[in-house]
Amino acid sequence: NAAVVEDKKNGLDGHNPWNEAAKKLESETLEEYGVEKVSELPFNYSGYRMQKGEEHEAQIYKKHYDILNKIAIKQNKVYESLSFLSPFISLRFLSMDVSNTSDKLHWKFTNAAEKYRLQKQEFLNYDIKDNSKYGERGYNMTEEKFKQLPKFNFTPPTNSEIIKENTQNILFLCLWLFLPFVGLLIFSKNK
């Protein structure tokens, strides 16, 4: 997407120390700590810069992702509002929720995965920042520190949550099953 590329181009790239935003961050950090070179900082500046770049890019992707999410929500609301016209629409939404393949769950899972990815990157970048030397290559995290790496947790909705979210779909399906029988009873009595 051109808008994402443009936003990234004008911001901090944590892996490119020569772009304008990275130079500005370096200058501000040196001034804040009262030193002249990044090697004089009390931490590994590379890990710090990578984390700041990660935070900047995460904001960009979240902004554009939220735009897509809002569009998808609007589209699904229109589609769902028409579900009284056909039992297949209601059945589609209900079956997608029951099988955990709905758009809602996709967005929920993706947000949880992105939140975890950011936590993990922060953990790794700050480990480099706090425990390695500037310019050091081949740094390895300790086994003890690695055990502290955050774990990914995601809980799909329970059956009761699925039923609650699909009350309208269940109602429309029941109507689609019930109304033909009522019509059959009415018309069969008239003959």
Regions found by a protein language model. Give the residues of each.
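Transmembrane alpha-helical segments and their membrane-interface loop/helix boundaries
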Residues: 1-191
